[in-house]
Amino acid sequence: MSWRSESIWIEFITGSRKTSNFCWAFILFLGSLGFLLVGTSSYLGRNFISLFASQQIIFFPQGIVMSFYGIAGLFISCYLWCTIFWNVGSGYDLFDRKEGIVRIFRWGFPGKSRRIFLRFLMKDIQSIRIEVKEGVSTRRVLYMEIRGQGAIPLIRADENFTTREIEQKAAELAYFLRVPIEVF
């Protein structure tokens, strides 16, 4: 989503609150809880899950391994739920032609760098760069090349834009900023 006028362009960035992240966190939580229940039921010798008898799974080594996978999955699921709760990666890109300033803001993990705020002068922008890597896992990323700072990604690599959409976005942004486009 974006908002645009003659002199200001604001591009809102979605972050980790995506439907796919909710689905993966939920599936991972249920799966790891199931593994932990099976491992615990094999240790205690009781049936917590009525699909099979607890005697079918011996605690050493299958029960230990299933408990380990369950605990590891719960940690990963907790990490995913925390990134969703904190909305890590969300923010905005603000391009202001009137003031000649570019502001990039992203939310990070709690701590010193929770708020990531970058500020550049528009005259320091060298180009808008499109990087396309074709293959099994196609990757298309849009960068802003800053003099003395390097390349700053404007679009995340996991966002599935078509080549045409990336080119369109790069062309509009380059026209707005009055800088050239580079393709790699």
Curated annotation (Swiss-Prot):
Q: Which domain of life is it from?
A: Eukaryota
Q: What keywords tag this UniProt record?
A: Chloroplast, Membrane, Photosynthesis, Plastid, Thylakoid, Transmembrane, Transmembrane helix
What are the record's GO terms for cellular component? chloroplast thylakoid membrane; photosystem I
Q: Which GO terms describe its biological process?
A: photosynthesis
Report membrane topology. Multi-pass membrane protein
Q: Name one Pfam family in it.
A: Ycf4
The subcellular location is: Plastid, Chloroplast thylakoid membrane
InterPro entries, per this entry?
PSI_Ycf4_assembly
Q: Membrane-crossing residues?
A: 22-42, 57-77
Which HAMAP family did the record assign?
Ycf4
Q: What does this protein do?
A: Seems to be required for the assembly of the photosystem I complex.
Q: What's this protein's family per the entry?
A: Belongs to the Ycf4 family.
Its name, as the record gives it, is Photosystem I assembly protein Ycf4
**Provenance organism:** Lobularia maritima
